[in-house]
Amino acid sequence: MRINPTTSGPGVSTLEKKNPGRXAQIIGPVLDVAFPPGKMPNIYNALVVKGRDTVGQQVNVTCEVQQLLGNNRVRAVAMSATDGLMRGMEVIDTGAPLSVPVGGATLGRIFNVLGEPVDNLGPVDTRTTFPIHRSAPAFIQLDTKLSIFETGIKVVDLLAPYRRGGKIGLFGGAGVGKTVLIMELINNIAKAHGGVSVFGGVGERTREGNDLYMEMKESGVINEQNLAESKVALVYGQMNEPPGARMRVGLTALTMAEYFRDVNEQDVLLFIDNIFRFVQAGSEVSALLGRMPSAVGYQPTLSTEMGSLQERITSTKEGSITSIQAVYVPADDLTDPAPATTFAHLDATTVLSRGLAAKGIYPAVDPLDSTSTMLQPRIVGEEHYETAQRVKQTSQRYKELQDIIAILGLDELSEEDRLTVARARKIERFLSQPFFVAEVFTGSPGKYVGLAETIRGFQLILSGELDGLPEQAFYLVGNIDEATAKAMNLDVESXLKK
């Protein structure tokens, strides 16, 4: 395990006279560096540019070697702004890839792509570091057993269950509850699985990253008093960063997650927001390196880059990394090469609906649009599969009848259809759930609902046993027993009002 020379002073000083080069050309975030004959750095080696700019300010820029050009020159991509760099500046080859701190010291902290803390909470223990470029686990290390990753969120566990060690695409516009759902998943994995989470903010708005951090502190996901008790490590490479940083920040987050999986043998949740920005940054870097663009102007190495990231996200015999990736779809075109390449790797999709959010049904997960490869009778069992299919059929029938209801009203429906609508409305409300992390906003305590409880609840609604209960009794409750208790309270309240 190497100490990271880019983040620890002694590491650089020992290498200073080892392999120095000189900056020969600087074009935006791309540097060409000349080295002495026979001393060329390897691809992916970290280079450090140290010196003073034209106004005497200290400059410290880390780059990553991307191409060997010949004539003892390499082309490298900078991980931070190249303002103030000049030709002739000394560039030191660290002799190793970028390495970042890993382990318990990362929890509750915010890092940049280099693994440097950016939250003004002091230095991080860098005794244990991992290089960000690592090979995917070998076949013999993989855990091929198909198992459900229980989240405690009814709509997810029943209709679009997550695979342990799988990859899930999270689709949703602004303001439909993506962040709250992410925070609830982080909270639930810590409580139910004893696991931790790593959040990789890739090329998104700095304001959103800051809001997420503040909300995590407010909801207790990050414990300010005792950082070691926090449940998440944050790695940010936001929109204002150079493309090199945005391209590599996903790997930094993944490396931190791999440590928890391989060394601590934990179940880890890895969030990537947004996977499209990873592809976009790769496209920018590819153009800067002079590669011929491929379809729609994307990099020719699109599938390779995506595969090198996604193949490291998997279950091994030690633990698992389950990844939830927000997917931006440019111009809502699902055939665009970026989302199309992402879909090839996904095991499940969770689609958030603005219509449900407008009705106040949270989490606003669309039960008909969300899918999962795990929803098969041989994996989840006949009972689960049958219940999920009947819930979907009832919801679909209600959706088909909505136009008729809007024009003619409920009275014009057949008795059977009226019963279907009543049950579908109960199902829709029962798919909502109070979240632990939303307690501070809603005032109602959060609920973790086990899969068996979830299936039992929906079976009771579908069988007609609860047809006599008012539909508002099913809104924002945990299991079905809470719904029946709420119905009794509503009866008592209405009797008192009379």
Curated annotation (Swiss-Prot):
Family: Belongs to the ATPase alpha/beta chains family.
Keywords: ATP synthesis, ATP-binding, CF(1), Chloroplast, Hydrogen ion transport, Ion transport, Membrane, Nucleotide-binding, Plastid, Thylakoid, Translocase, Transport
Domain of life (superkingdom): Eukaryota
UniProt protein name: ATP synthase subunit beta, chloroplastic
Membrane topology, as annotated: Peripheral membrane protein
Alphabetized InterPro entries for the sequence: AAA+_ATPase, ATP-synt_VA_C, ATP_synth_F1_bsu, ATPase_a/bsu_AS, ATPase_alpha/beta_chains, ATPase_F1/V1/A1_a/bsu_N, ATPase_F1/V1/A1_a/bsu_N_sf, ATPase_F1/V1/A1_a/bsu_nucl-bd
Molecular function terms, GO-annotated: ATP binding; ATP hydrolysis activity; proton-transporting ATP synthase activity, rotational mechanism
Record text on subunit structure and interactions: F-type ATPases have 2 components, CF(1) - the catalytic core - and CF(0) - the membrane proton channel. CF(1) has five subunits: alpha(3), beta(3), gamma(1), delta(1), epsilon(1). CF(0) has four main subunits: a(1), b(1), b'(1) and c(9-12).
Function: Produces ATP from ADP in the presence of a proton gradient across the membrane. The catalytic sites are hosted primarily by the beta subunits.
Protein source organism: Aristolochia macrophylla (Dutchman's pipe vine)
Classification lineage: Eukaryota, Viridiplantae, Streptophyta, Embryophyta, Tracheophyta
Record-level GO BP terms: proton motive force-driven mitochondrial ATP synthesis
Enzyme class, spelled out: translocase
Transmembrane segments: none
Gene3D superfamilies for this protein: 2.40.10.170, Bovine Mitochondrial F1-atpase, Atp Synthase Beta Chain, Chain D, domain 3, P-loop containing nucleotide triphosphate hydrolases
